[in-house]
């Protein structure tokens, strides 16, 4: 058929395409959810038990989506001693829009200036919390295409999740994840194993162009999330079953075939319910499921329920959450470290879960495992796909390196500063009043930011934003942070138009000696 390709093109693809390195960034301050319950005057446990959240990271007016992404990209490049020359594609997934035309990706290109590398494909991708996954799939597809030039792809997912005062506010958060994508990766995307579901709904959306706050239909949002999970899992199971049949194995796929399961996490309790939901899918698809004992023990009464009738059935939910408790503890709970401690990061949420998993298990434990990832973005778009971890867990291996790079994750979370709820509320008020302003100088201090964090210096009268980086103790001049470490491709250096914009130096001693960068002429 015209436009189609033969199936036997496997030998043409690069080997083991996937995630080579991963970096995560979250704000240096948080509000305690127990204290927030008291401050908001709600019942004890509403946020901590009902939502499953312990702490919520948040940004001051010193950080925006550009600064979050600048920080996480430079940290990934520095930690892995990478040259900016080795990046051939850079794509950003975000729903935090501060400019309706200029992309975050173009702001990040300032980090590439010293290398002279401007031959970098990709742009921003947006659909609620799904944008990071779409960007990641685009990167995988680029490497497996005729357009690939042998260099890495860099995928960035970042967001600032804020809500108006009320029930939704404790489900906020902020952060960014950067992923280096290439061949011979330790985290390999299983080709052909994606179950996707796309549908129209007004479950969560942001129609007000001057507000950061969404319009949310809470009940519909939960139904959309769970129905998408049902559909994606069904499509995924059909695809892997078809693959197995071609390989001579004819059996059904169940959750036991996943070593770990991670999910987009608006809040941790929904993830726990999602594991229960998948077990319900397994139960209903197996007409011979043993209910006298085992994981399905005592569930015979639910044999004839219909999935579409059970989204808000408390009896079904309670029974399957109990039945799936051990499954959740073994395969999912560890992945919720960042979600529980930092909140919902929107596009990077599911990849924060991946980072949490990698940070808490040894390479030997992870080797050879199949990890399922469920990504969901309101509106709505969802995919369930799987990653196969390499078998090579030897010291110095790619798997050893990626887990070692995340070994300080819990310590970084513990090093953050706890902020009182009233100060948090004041920060939210400042953001609401100033996030869209021109000719604005941020009010909050940079002293509480982590070392190496990029921050907003000012917004000029034309809405052009200027950034600086908080120095890293022990480093030399800040310019060294973006120098070429391992130049591999010779480029003609093309001066960036951003350099024509006057640099705005730090105005106070507390801001330190920094190199400021601007997003240039709009």
Swiss-Prot record:
Protein name: Hydroxymethylglutaryl-CoA synthase, cytoplasmic
Quaternary structure annotation from Swiss-Prot or TrEMBL: Homodimer.
Consequence recorded when altering residue 69 to A: Does not significantly affect biophysicochemical properties
Location(s) in or outside the cell: Cytoplasm
Encoding gene, per UniProt annotation: HMGCS1
Enzyme Commission (EC) number: 2.3.3.10
Known role: Catalyzes the condensation of acetyl-CoA with acetoacetyl-CoA to form HMG-CoA, which is converted by HMG-CoA reductase (HMGCR) into mevalonate, a precursor for cholesterol synthesis.
Active-site positions on this chain: 95 (proton donor/acceptor), 129 (acyl-thioester intermediate), 264 (proton donor/acceptor)
Variant or mutagenesis effect after changing residue 59 to A: Does not significantly affect biophysicochemical properties
UniProt GO molecular function: hydroxymethylglutaryl-CoA synthase activity
Main subcellular location: cytoplasm
Binding annotation for (3S)-3-hydroxy-3-methylglutaryl-CoA: 43-44, 129, 167, 171, 221, 264, 273, 344, 378
Enzyme class of the recorded protein, top EC level: transferase
PROSITE patterns: HMG_COA_SYNTHASE
Pathway named in the protein's UniProt entry: Metabolic intermediate biosynthesis; (R)-mevalonate biosynthesis; (R)-mevalonate from acetyl-CoA: step 2/3
UniProt cross-references to InterPro entries, sorted A to Z: HMG_CoA_synt_AS, HMG_CoA_synt_C_dom, HMG_CoA_synth_N, HMG_CoA_synthase_euk, Thiolase-like
Keywords: Cholesterol biosynthesis, Cholesterol metabolism, Cytoplasm, Lipid biosynthesis, Lipid metabolism, Steroid biosynthesis, Steroid metabolism, Sterol biosynthesis, Sterol metabolism, Transferase
Reaction catalysed by this enzyme: acetoacetyl-CoA + acetyl-CoA + H2O = (3S)-3-hydroxy-3-methylglutaryl-CoA + CoA + H(+)
């Amino acid at each position: 058929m015209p436009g189609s390709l033969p199936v036997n093109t496997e030998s043409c693809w690069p080997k083991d395409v996937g995630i080579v390195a991963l970096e995560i960034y979250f704000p240096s301050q948080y509000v305690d959810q127990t204290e927030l319950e008291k401050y908001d005057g709600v019942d004890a446990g509403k946020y901590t038990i009902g939502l499953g959240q312990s702490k919520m990271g948040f940004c001051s007016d010193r950080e925006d989506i550009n600064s979050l992404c600048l920080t996480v990209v430079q940290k990934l490049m520095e930690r892995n001693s990478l040259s900016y020359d080795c990046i051939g594609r850079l794509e950003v997934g975000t729903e935090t829009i501060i400019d309706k035309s200029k992309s975050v990706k173009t702001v990040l290109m300032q980090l590439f200036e010293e290398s002279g590398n401007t031959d970098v494909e990709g742009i921003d991708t947006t659909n609620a919390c799904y944008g990071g996954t779409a960007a990641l799939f685009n990167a995988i597809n680029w490497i497996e295409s005729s357009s690939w030039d042998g260099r890495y792809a860099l995928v960035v997912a970042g967001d600032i999740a804020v809500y108006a005062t009320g029930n939704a506010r404790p489900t906020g958060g902020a952060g960014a994840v950067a992923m280096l994508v290439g061949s011979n990766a330790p985290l390999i995307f299983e080709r052909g194993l994606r179950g996707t579901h796309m549908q129209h709904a007004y479950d969560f959306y942001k129609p007000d162009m001057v507000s950061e706050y969404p319009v949310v239909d809470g009940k519909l949002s939960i139904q959309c999330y769970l129905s998408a999970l049902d559909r994606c899992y069904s499509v995924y199971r059909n695809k892997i079953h078809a693959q197995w049949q071609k390989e001579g194995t004819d059996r059904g796929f169940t959750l036991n075939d996943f070593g770990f399961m991670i999910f987009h996490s608006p809040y941790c309790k929904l993830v726990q319910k999602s594991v229960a939901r998948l077990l319900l899918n397994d139960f209903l698809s197996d007409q011979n499921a043993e209910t006298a004992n085992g994981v399905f023990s005592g569930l015979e009464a639910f044999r004839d329920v219909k999935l579409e009738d059970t989204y808000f059935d408390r009896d079904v939910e309670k029974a399957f959450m109990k039945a799936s408790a051990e499954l959740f503890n073994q395969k999912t709970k560890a992945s919720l470290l960042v979600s529980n401690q930092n909140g919902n990061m929107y596009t990077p949420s599911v990849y924060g879960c991946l980072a949490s998993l990698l940070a808490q298990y040894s390479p030997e434990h992870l080797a050879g495992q199949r990890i399922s990832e469920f990504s969901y973005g309101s509106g709505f778009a969802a995919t369930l796909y799987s990653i196969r971890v390499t078998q090579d867990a030897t010291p110095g291996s790619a798997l050893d390196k990626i887990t070692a790079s995340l070994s300080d994750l819990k310590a970084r979370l513990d090093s953050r500063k706890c902020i009182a709820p009233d100060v948090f509320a004041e920060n939210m008020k400042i953001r609401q009043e100033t996030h869209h302003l021109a000719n604005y100088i941020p009010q909050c201090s940079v002293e509480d930011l982590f070392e190496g964090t990029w921050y907003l210096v000012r917004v000029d009268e034309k809405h052009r934003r200027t950034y600086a980086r908080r120095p890293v103790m022990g480093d030399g001049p800040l310019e060294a942070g973006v120098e070429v470490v391992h130049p591999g491709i010779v480029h003609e250096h093309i001066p960036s138009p951003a350099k024509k914009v006057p640099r705005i130096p730090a105005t106070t001693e507390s801001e330190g000696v920094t190199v400021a960068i601007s997003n240039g002429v709009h």
